[in-house]
Amino acid sequence: MQQRRPVRRALLSVSDKAGIVEFAQALSARGVELLSTGGTARLLAEKGLPVTEVSDYTGFPEMMDGRVKTLHPKVHGGILGRRGLDDAIMEEHQILPIDMVVVNLYPFAQTVAREGCSLEDAVENIDIGGPTMVRSAAKNHKDVAIVVKSSDYDAIIKEMDANEGSLTLATRFDLAIKAFEHTAAYDSMIANYFGSMVPAYHGESKEAAGRFPRTLNLNFIKKQDMRYGENSHQQAAFYIEENVKEASVATATQVQGKALSYNNIADTDAALECVKEFAEPACVIVKHANPCGVAIGHSILDAYDRAYKTDPTSAFGGIIAFNRELDAETAQAIISRQFVEVIIAPSASEEALKITAAKQNVRVLTCGQWGERVPGLDFKRVNGGLLVQDRDLGMVGAEELRVVTKRQPSEQELRDALFCWKVAKFVKSNAIVYAKNNMTIGIGAGQMSRVYSAKIAGIKAADEGLEVKGSSMASDAFFPFRDGIDAAAAAGVTCVIQPGGSIRDDEVIAAADEHGIAMLFTDMRHFRH
């Protein structure tokens, strides 16, 4: 049973007025009586719409600078009244049934995001009447439609036209879910903001207490269900943040290929975040969340050719990310050379998409061009808890490096050192990266001892016939012993970049001097677990 309910009277009170005039016009044209408040009522009246101010309906004026507008029994009785059950009491108190409530809330998030926002500004942008109406209407969804998203306006009018001015219970229930999600997210933002003021806020003090609130409330929106998770016996879904401000796998548009898997999304994120580190045309190939080949070149085709050479075996079935538009020539090189799961780039030419379309299983994503990296939080779930930290956006430049050995690096060694240092940031610890002429030639990832990561990087370079002599090596953390330097020297490395900070730094530096290796300290670590 559809349990349709006709919409005869609607209350409209919105902060974000995008589309509200057109929606109100459509409702009015279908015989819906309009109630409204404050600025919304004035806007509708200016547009020539017949609208009744809520204060005229209730006989009670807005007061306290707008703090009290809709908190009245004639409003909430009209929303909460159960049709067929509360009709007599509503008639006795001259309460009119309100069949639709259209509300969005004061812009609290935008207010507190503004530089210099005071606590008083934040407090005045905490909506009280709005969430109360939203919750009332959502609770009584059996009889009332609650609309909190302007993106629903058109669909609502279409359904009313298809149902003689009525909405079905299924629609009202879906709108109620959106409403409760909306108020939950709103309250979470307020709780997080106030939580970050504790314990510093006492009376006149307005200094924030720290980066993290005492209670962390998170709101993510489900983008898609997955066939399964990391493994086939695990169920999974992909959730995204609302209003993501940076180009990412969460904001990317899939323009081709079958549905993304859980592992596809995780690996694509790793590849894209790595390629963002480079200003020059760059390519990153990822397998199991680790870069297996990275290069910069005079074009993305050149970068891809060089990245692929690092480890063609691991590149099979990998994820490829670019920081420039995917062109036809590069697309052809990829398709003719290897099996690839996902290609992601800021954009893709029509010719490139025609080429990749020949391989139906290849997923192509475009994410738009990115600007500066946006600070945020990283989360790691542990049994019974959640680890939270700032995103690792740290990176050093040449001017911040310290040469700690007798020999200075050459210009090319320095360029390669900075290049592989960027790559090492995205390799699972313990991470060792060999690079020469702006391409990786060997990557040792995820080993329990740093020396074995160094050995693996050398083995990979030798297996592919890549010359290590004269290369630079990056280590994501300090060398606890000299053995990693000895292994690098045996492979042919002539420059090392690492954080420093070991109690055996002197021993490690001495080993570098013995081998004639130039060593640079970054004083910044990039563990990745």
Curated annotation (Swiss-Prot):
<dbReference type="Pfam" id="PF01808">
    <property type="entry name" value="AICARFT_IMPCHas"/>
</dbReference>
<keyword id="KW-0658">Purine biosynthesis</keyword>
<dbReference type="InterPro" id="IPR002695">
    <property type="entry name" value="PurH-like"/>
</dbReference>
<feature type="modified residue" description="N6-acetyllysine">
    <location>
        <position position="287"/>
    </location>
</feature>
<comment type="similarity">
    <text>Belongs to the PurH family.</text>
</comment>
<protein>
    <recommendedName>
        <fullName>Bifunctional purine biosynthesis protein PurH</fullName>
        <ecNumber>2.1.2.3</ecNumber>
        <ecNumber>3.5.4.10</ecNumber>
    </recommendedName>
</protein>
<dbReference type="GO" id="GO:0006189">
    <property type="term" value="P:'de novo' IMP biosynthetic process"/>
</dbReference>
<keyword id="KW-0511">Multifunctional enzyme</keyword>
<comment type="pathway">
    <text>Purine metabolism; IMP biosynthesis via de novo pathway; IMP from 5-formamido-1-(5-phospho-D-ribosyl)imidazole-4-carboxamide: step 1/1.</text>
</comment>
<dbReference type="Pfam" id="PF02142">
    <property type="entry name" value="MGS"/>
</dbReference>
<dbReference type="InterPro" id="IPR024051">
    <property type="entry name" value="AICAR_Tfase_dup_dom_sf"/>
</dbReference>
<keyword id="KW-0378">Hydrolase</keyword>
<keyword id="KW-0808">Transferase</keyword>
<dbReference type="GO" id="GO:0003937">
    <property type="term" value="F:IMP cyclohydrolase activity"/>
</dbReference>
<keyword id="KW-0007">Acetylation</keyword>
<dbReference type="InterPro" id="IPR011607">
    <property type="entry name" value="MGS-like_dom"/>
</dbReference>
<dbReference type="GO" id="GO:0005829">
    <property type="term" value="C:cytosol"/>
</dbReference>
<dbReference type="GO" id="GO:0004643">
    <property type="term" value="F:phosphoribosylaminoimidazolecarboxamide formyltransferase activity"/>
</dbReference>
<comment type="pathway">
    <text>Purine metabolism; IMP biosynthesis via de novo pathway; 5-formamido-1-(5-phospho-D-ribosyl)imidazole-4-carboxamide from 5-amino-1-(5-phospho-D-ribosyl)imidazole-4-carboxamide (10-formyl THF route): step 1/1.</text>
</comment>
<dbReference type="InterPro" id="IPR016193">
    <property type="entry name" value="Cytidine_deaminase-like"/>
</dbReference>
<dbReference type="InterPro" id="IPR036914">
    <property type="entry name" value="MGS-like_dom_sf"/>
</dbReference>
<feature type="domain" description="MGS-like">
    <location>
        <begin position="1"/>
        <end position="148"/>
    </location>
</feature>
